[in-house]
Every structure is written in C-alpha cells, then in structure tokens.
C-alpha cells in the first residue's frame, strides 16, 4: 500500500460547523499540516474538529495573518474534518498522507 501526499482541504470557512473532508472508504489519513489564513483587516476566531472533537478551538488569528500548525493526527475511514470561523474571509489549508 503506497503512502500518498495529499491535500485534504483547500476551502473558505463557513460561519457554522461544516464538513470539509471525509476519509474515503478503506483509507487512513494522517493530517500533518493545518494552515488558517485570515484575509480580513480584523482578527478572527477559527475552529477545526477531527471527527466532531475540537482540535483547534476558537483560536484567534490576527488581521491578514496565517496560523500554521504541524501535527500527526490519524483519521480512519469515514472520519471527518470540520471547520468554521467568525468570518467567511478565512481559508483552511489541510494536508497530510493517505494510505
């Protein structure tokens, strides 16, 4: 079974919790990097949940700034990545490895 580097999420945030990615059947994912980019002139808050459990909870990202987090979080078949922010001018970038 090959390990494949993969972009899981490249999406603008919603202001209520929304599913950004679901692990495909017969796959396991390791999330290795999360970036939250605020493109507004004011600070925002953002949250990321792995399988409905808060991983990043209401973190503040400054105006026109990016939060970058390295991690090694395993997600199994059908588990989800969800996210939301206080503004829709926030972008989530989440990548890792799929096998």
Map each language-model feature to its residues.
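Solvent-exposed, conformationally flexible loop/turn segments
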Residues: 13-18, 61-67
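Short solvent-exposed strand-capping/beta-turn motif centered on an Asx-Ser/Thr pair
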Residues: 36-41, 86
């Amino acid at each position: 079974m090959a390990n494949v580097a993969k972009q899981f999420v490249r999406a603008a945030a919603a202001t209520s919790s929304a599913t950004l990615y679901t692990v495909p059947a017969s796959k396991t994912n390791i999330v290795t990097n999360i970036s939250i980019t605020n493109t507004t002139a004011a600070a925002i808050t953002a949250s990321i949940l792995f399988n409905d459990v808060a991983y990043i909870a209401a973190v503040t990202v400054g105006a026109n700034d990016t939060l970058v987090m390295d991690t090694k979080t395993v997600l199994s078949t059908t588990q989800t990545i969800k996210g939301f922010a206080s503004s829709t001018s926030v972008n989530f970038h989440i990548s890792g490895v799929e096998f």
